[in-house]
From Swiss-Prot:
Key words of the record: Antibiotic resistance, Cell membrane, Cell shape, Cell wall biogenesis/degradation, Hydrolase, Membrane, Peptidoglycan synthesis, Transmembrane, Transmembrane helix
A GO biological-process term: peptidoglycan biosynthetic process
UniProt organism field: Anoxybacillus flavithermus (strain DSM 21510 / WK1)
Similarity comment: Belongs to the UppP family.
Protein name (database record): Undecaprenyl-diphosphatase
A single GO cellular-component term on record: plasma membrane
Compartments where located: Cell membrane
Length: 273
């Protein structure tokens, strides 16, 4: 085992954790950091590297669970004390929000994996996602849902429809859902909270299915890389989520949209210029 490869695993976990929940496309960053620089497939193998990315994504999911643990306890009626009165987020809101993309994802998973995962499609997704985010800040409705507990079923469903755009690689799940939320009258913070809470079951489920299919690639020799990457992703996702939630109502989405366009330009220059 080489220390340099452990450092690469740590860096990949950092990139995953820092970008998974920000509206900047973790896929786009992995193209630059892994495919163009660290090349995890060289020390983990092609399928081992893909499994590694699933494992570090679970580190990010765990971070979201920690940040929103009180809300998850409330959703599952496990929170001690008096139950919140009045409007509140429920499991039905989550289900309604997940339904559209969940159905399309199951129906077209193989097609997406085979035909849509390429550098060119990610580049297109980065730019189109940026335009959606700019449009959300410019044309979003007057805020009627200040907090995640004010969200209606209609808003949740529309956000779910917009989330279907994230099936296109590079579009970004959080970028599409936060934009969709703002467009239908959620505050930026409410849209972000709903996005992150909704991401946990769908990411955990997808990762679990992938691991069941590919668990054999987590070998004894490769295990240290998986552990380091998982812990790194967890720590940096924890920091990134908390930082983003403090930031989003102040800076809104346009700065992230500009960053995405710059990232797309870098990928274009490196791959196509």
């Amino acid at each position: 085992m080489h220390i340099i490869e452990l450092i690469k695993a740590l860096i990949l976990g950092l990139v995953e954790g820092a970008t998974e929940f920000a509206p900047v496309s973790s896929t786009g960053h992995m193209i630059i950091v892994d495919d163009m620089w660290l090349k995890s497939s060289e020390f983990l193998g092609k399928y081992g590297a893909n499994t590694f990315k699933v494992v570090i994504q679970l580190g990010s999911v765990l971070a979201a669970v920690v940040v929103f643990k009180d809300k998850f306890f409330e959703l599952l009626y496990l929170r001690k004390g008096e139950v919140r009165k009045g409007p509140r987020l429920t499991l039905m809101h989550i289900f309604v929000g997940l339904l559209p993309a969940g159905v399309l994802g199951v129906l077209f998973e193989d097609y997406i994996d085979e035909h849509l995962f390429s550098t060119k499609t990610v580049l297109i997704g980065l730019v189109l996602g940026a335009l959606l985010m700019i449009a959300a800040d410019r044309f979003g409705k007057r805020t009627v849902a200040q907090t995640v507990d004010d969200i209606t079923y209609k808003q949740a469903f529309i956000v779910g429809l917009v989330q279907c755009l994230s099936l296109w690689p590079g579009f970004s799940r959080s970028g599409s859902t936060i934009s969709g939320g703002v467009l239908v009258g959620m505050s930026h913070r409410a849209a972000a909270d709903f996005t992150f809470i909704m991401a946990v079951p769908i990411m955990a489920g997808a990762s679990a299915i992938s691991l069941l299919k590919n668990w054999q690639y987590i070998t004894f020799d490769a295990l240290p890389f998986f552990v380091v990457g998982f812990i790194s992703a967890f720590v940096f996702a924890l920091l990134a989520i908390r930082f983003f939630l403090r930031l989003i109502n102040r800076v809104r989405l346009v700065p992230f949209a500009i960053y995405r366009i710059v990232l797309a330009a870098v990928i274009y220059v490196v791959y196509f210029a």
